[in-house]
C-alpha cells in the first residue's frame, strides 16, 4: 500500500513471504485500517505480518499468529502511527518500533492499557480454526468503545457487554469454568507455541519463562 487509504475488513492473510519488508502488508504513507483480519504464517525480512513506513494505521479485532521475520519482528513500525487494539498476538516475533497496543493479548506481555498475556484457547489453531473455546480468556476482554458490530464470519458482537478479542466472537458473554493443567519443564524440552490446553510429560518445555507465558490462573508447573 503506497499513498492510499484503504479499509480492510474480514480478510485472511496467510502464508505470504517477502524478501523485503512486510510479509503480508507493507504500508507506505498510508492512512488505512484493518478490522476482523487474520494474519497467519507470514514471513519477511522485517515485519513478518506488517510493516509501516509513514502514515497512520490501525488494527482492530485482528488475530495474528506465527508471523516471523529475519530481524525477529512480527509487526514493525519504522515511522508513523500504528495502533493495535482488541487483538490477539500469539506465537509471533516481536513487536518492533513505537506501536500503541491496548486491550490485546500479547504473548510475553506488552505495555499498554488493559493488555495481558494468556494462552488464547483457540479451537484448533493447527488446522486453522481460530474460533474461541468456551473457557478462552479472550471472551469479554475487549474495549466497549466503538464496538465493531460483527466478527469475520458475520456473527454479531456483544453490544451490551465487552466484546471478545481477535477476529472471532464467541456466543458467550464471559468464559466458562477453566480446568487447570500441569505444565512440564526439563532441560531436554523444547519451547514451542501452544494455543489451547496441550500438555504432555513426554513433551516438556525448556524454560520457566516460556512456560509462564502459557499459564492461566490455576495452572501448575513440574520441573
Where do the model's predicted regions map?
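C-terminal accessory segments
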Residues: 114-169
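Acidic glycine-/aspartate-rich tracts in secreted/extracellular proteins
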Residues: 69, 92-93, 106-112, 126-127, ...
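Right-handed parallel beta-helix/beta-solenoid
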Residues: 119-128, 171-210
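Predominantly extracellular beta-rich ligand-binding scaffolds that present long acidic/polar faces
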Residues: 1-133
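Residues within well-ordered beta-strands of beta-sheet-rich folds
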Residues: 88, 105, 184, 220-222
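Acidic Gly/Asp/Thr-rich repetitive segments characteristic of extracellular carbohydrate-active
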Residues: 153, 158, 164, 188-223
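Flexible, charged surface loops at secondary-structure boundaries
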Residues: 1, 177-179, 213-217
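Proline-centered structural pivot motif
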Residues: 6, 32, 57, 143, ...
Amino acid at each position: 500500500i503506497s499513498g492510499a487509504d484503504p479499509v480492510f475488513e474480514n480478510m485472511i492473510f496467510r502464508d505470504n513471504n517477502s524478501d523485503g519488508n512486510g510479509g503480508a502488508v507493507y504500508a507506505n504513507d498510508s492512512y488505512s485500517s484493518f478490522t476482523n483480519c487474520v494474519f497467519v504464517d507470514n514471513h519477511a525480512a522485517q515485519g513478518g505480518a506488517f510493516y509501516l513506513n509513514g502514515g497512520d494505521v490501525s488494527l482492530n479485532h485482528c488475530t495474528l499468529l506465527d508471523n516471523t521475520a529475519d530481524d525477529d519482528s512480527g509487526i514493525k513500525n519504522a515511522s508513523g502511527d500504528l495502533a493495535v487494539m482488541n487483538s490477539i498476538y500469539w506465537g509471533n516475533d516481536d513487536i518492533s518500533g513505537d506501536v500503541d497496543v491496548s486491550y490485546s493479548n500479547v504473548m510475553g506481555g506488552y505495555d499498554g492499557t488493559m493488555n495481558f498475556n494468556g494462552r488464547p484457547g483457540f479451537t484448533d489453531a493447527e488446522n486453522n480454526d481460530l474460533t474461541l473455546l468456551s473457557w478462552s480468556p479472550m471472551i469479554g476482554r475487549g474495549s466497549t468503545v466503538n464496538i465493531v458490530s460483527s466478527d469475520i464470519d458475520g456473527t454479531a458482537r456483544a453490544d451490551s457487554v465487552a466484546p471478545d478479542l481477535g477476529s472471532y466472537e464467541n456466543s458467550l458473554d464471559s468464559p466458562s469454568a477453566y480446568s487447570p493443567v500441569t505444565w512440564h519443564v526439563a532441560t531436554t524440552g523444547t519451547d514451542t507455541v501452544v494455543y489451547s490446553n496441550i500438555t504432555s510429560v513426554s513433551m516438556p518445555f525448556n524454560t520457566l519463562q516460556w512456560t509462564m507465558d502459557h499459564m492461566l490462573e490455576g495452572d501448575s508447573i513440574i520441573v
